[in-house]
Amino acid sequence: MIGKLTGRLDYRSTDHVLIDVRGVGYIVYCSDRTLAALPGVGEVVALYTDMVVREDLMQLFGFMSLAEKEWHRLLCSVQGVGAKVSLAILGALGPDGVSRAIALGDWASVKSAKGVGPKTAQRIVLDLKDKAPGVMAMGGTVAQAMEGAVEVVEVIEPAAPAPRKAAPPGGAGAATAGALSALSNLGYGPSDAAAAVAQAAAEAPEAGETDLIRAALRLLAPKT
């Protein structure tokens, strides 16, 4: 199985890219959101990947974070949801948006993705609601995937121009994971904690871990 690819971006299309890894080109299918976030042609790129092998088909799907990869795997496990629909959902909402929608039972947001009807959206939310806390707690990002990428590729192709440096790990995913961990340590159940953190993150997308914890605790406090 191929779990991650690091190489140079050779070509991009409307739904896939070609990544050159030591002279071997890999076609990787991605969501619209992931495609938009990738660097330019000729630059170093790293993607987490999921490989699908069937009798008549072998495909690689690429993701910017471990959470996105896990949501793809889970979405494809739902009856009536294939890789194309999964990528449409991730492209429309992003992994954080999928986490929020499923944790909050917001099937209307899931339905906003191309090719997703109301029944399928409701089934997704119902089947995956218990999975949201675990995915939201994942902290792997593309920045972590890029660690060492420059050195590896430059050894292979020393004449190539140096790529842009990857941003340090962190951001909304790390804040969400930290907030979930804190609420779990305080004794809150996974589903309640995930719903509270998801709502807090939706109301304040730029909030850090501490602010998310405070906001989630207010939401979880008994109503008088």
From Swiss-Prot:
Q: Where is it found, in Gene Ontology cellular component terms? A: cytoplasm; Holliday junction helicase complex; Holliday junction resolvase complex
List every stretch annotated Domain II: 65-143
Coiled-coil ranges per UniProt: none
Record-linked HAMAP family: DNA_HJ_migration_RuvA
Q: Describe the protein's quaternary organization and the partners it interacts with.
A: Homotetramer. Forms an RuvA(8)-RuvB(12)-Holliday junction (HJ) complex. HJ DNA is sandwiched between 2 RuvA tetramers; dsDNA enters through RuvA and exits via RuvB. An RuvB hexamer assembles on each DNA strand where it exits the tetramer. Each RuvB hexamer is contacted by two RuvA subunits (via domain III) on 2 adjacent RuvB subunits; this complex drives branch migration. In the full resolvosome a probable DNA-RuvA(4)-RuvB(12)-RuvC(2) complex forms which resolves the HJ.
The family this protein is said to belong to: Belongs to the RuvA family.
What is the protein's given name? Holliday junction branch migration complex subunit RuvA
